[in-house]
Amino acid sequence: MCAAPNNPVIRARNLKRYYRRGSETVKALDGVDLDLRMGEMVSILGPSGSGKTTLVNLLSCLDAPTEGTLAVNGHEVAGRSEDQLADVRRGTMGFVFQKFYLLPTLTVAENVELSLLFCRRPVHRAATMEVLRQVGLADRASHRPRELSGGQMQRAAIARALIVEPKILIADEPTGNLDSHSGEAIFDLFRSLVVQRGILLVVTTHNLALGYLSDRVFTLHDGRIVKEEAGRGA
């Protein structure tokens, strides 16, 4: 079952995630509602400890909620086993993180193709080159990571996420290790990918200026969404 074109591809209602810390209950998320659709770029803003990573882990099906309902691409997440959550992620989601996680002994093209190997899909170099072209790295395909700038390494990581043709791209603090110019270039790339591919792109950041380049901006504080605004991309 997949979400209909006009329906949310991610829908969360009263989403809560609590943890035990000794005798204390920590409310990492405390009642979050979200409707996220294909073809939009969404930023989740908030300081460290606000619940951004916890929320992203839930939206990514890397964790399950303590309470509330969460449906991803038509699949209810609550009550599923780790294997079942992996099935929801596989072929639906791509991930980009603050750290690039590129293998130093492989070329850029080979690093990108690792995602296909993990998903047990055939590797076609022409498809790899097309993805590298989209992220502006076609001329770096045979380079090793050590020959790239920080911004170029993050572009390679984005290409690796895109090669599996995800419907949803989750980026957790993707510009945290980049300078301001490179960070803005990455957000510009994200915007173009949303337009070209029609994907849902969810990005977390503590950088207000970058966050407002999205279509919609959600601000988290103490595990709650305290503000929803239109971004400059809307």
Enumerate the predicted regions with their spans.
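Residue-level detector of flexible, active-site-proximal loop/helix-junction positions
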Residues: 84, 224, 232
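ABC-family P-loop ATPase nucleotide-binding domain
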Residues: 1-18, 227-234
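ABC family nucleotide-binding domain
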Residues: 8-220
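H-loop (His-switch) and adjacent beta-strand-loop-beta switch element
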Residues: 217-229
